[in-house]
Amino acid sequence: MKKNDVFASYAVVPPQAARNPEFYQKRNLPIPTLSVVSENDKGVVISGMKMLATSAIFANEIWIGNLIPLAPDQVKQSITCAIPCNSNGLSLWMRQPLSKHYDNQFDAPLSWNQDETDVLVTKMKH
């Protein structure tokens, strides 16, 4: 990283609504948490969402991992890897930074007093 002057962010938390896979399984819906969907000669193909990628909009790559313990049946979600921010199918959804335009601190508690650059990372398989 130092040699190539790479700035990396991390995405280590599934979206809160996706932390209960049973909800999606009962409705026959795909679980939105980032998962391995296939493997090929080039490596693994991933798809889904991860959160808390602070400053990812400024990063060269994002380190994917898991901060919250996973259940034994969540093998596909247990990937740890780094992905370049210019990867095909990668989208970064960020909170609005420095929300001084709100009328009060209650409407934007995190970004009222400081810059807030946490990002939701979505990766569509390609």
Question: How would you describe each model-predicted region?
Answer:
Residues 10, 15-126:
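FAD-binding core of flavoproteins
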